[in-house]
Amino acid sequence: MAEAVGAVALIAAPARRRWLWSVLAAMLGLLTARISALEVHTPKEIFVVNGTQGKLTCTFDSPNTTGWLTTVSWSFQPDGTDSAVSFFHYSQGQVYIGDYPPFKDRVTWAGDLDKKDASINIENIQAVHNGTYICDVKNPPDIVVRPGHIRLHVVEIDNLLVFLVWVVVGTVTAVVLGLTLLISLVLVVLYRRKHSKRDYTGCSTSERLSPVKQAPRKCPSDTEGLVKSPPSAGSHQGPVIYAQLDHSGGHHSGKINKSESVVYADIRKD
């Protein structure tokens, strides 16, 4: 009996090992397939007035939902240094703030992991807070991530007003220059079109329809010969009656008017 049980156990052992390896391979494949790069988005730089609250905005994109394993860490790299100091950590709904003096009792959580927002607020910002802030988010299995960097500038209220004035002046100047350039281009185009029409040497429609005045050709006719021929001796020439005809279509007609003298009768008395 014992020998039979041992034989069954020996036969089942390889099958069990194959089953375990299959399960592990499937789990590993599923885990590998779900791993993807988590993208963090932050503004490149922000300006905050000295003594006011500043919000460091940080959002992220992840194909996986957030949960208890999602963590957020903020670090600070002061100006002129190469190393960063971690001063804020958020995990499982809890906020952990370090003992770094510039941020003690100044930092509050302003994000919402359900909306994939990892922002924070810093109260009473001072000149010591000038530097680069680093937002790092982990959302397993999304572990491949590039942190976001924000360059924070602390400015005085007077400097900020001057900066805003220069921004407005620059914007208005750019708009005025753009409009001036556009108007100049339009005027140049209209000027060229106008002068191109003046320089055109072809015949226009009005020119084709306008009459050309020519010197009347004198063609001797019988009547003119009779009129101009000197009277023969002993003959008595009577009065010559002339008439002037106006070959026009009417007073308001657009036709060309032409007038000429026609000899209608030559009365002679012998």
Swiss-Prot record:
GO terms for biological process: positive regulation of cell migration. It is a single-pass type I membrane protein. The modification Phosphoserine is found at residues 204, 206, 210, 221, 261. It holds the Pfam family V-set. Gene3D superfamilies: Immunoglobulins. InterPro entries: Ig-like_dom (IPR007110), Ig-like_dom_sf (IPR036179), Ig-like_fold (IPR013783), Ig_sub (IPR003599), Ig_V-set (IPR013106), Myelin_P0-rel (IPR000920). Keywords: Disulfide bond, Glycoprotein, Immunoglobulin domain, Membrane, Phosphoprotein, Signal, Transmembrane, Transmembrane helix. Phosphorylated on tyrosine residues upon stimulation with pervanadate and concanavalin-A (ConA). Phosphorylation at Tyr-242 and Tyr-264 is required for interaction with PTPN11/SHP-2. Dephosphorylated by PTPN11/SHP-2 (in vitro). Residues 36-151 form the Ig-like V-type domain. Residues 36-162 are extracellular. SUPFAM superfamilies: Immunoglobulin. PANTHER family: MYELIN P0 RELATED (PTHR13869), MYELIN PROTEIN ZERO-LIKE PROTEIN 1 (PTHR13869:SF19). This is Myelin protein zero-like protein 1. It comes from Mus musculus. The lineage of its organism: Eukaryota, Metazoa, Chordata, Craniata, Vertebrata.
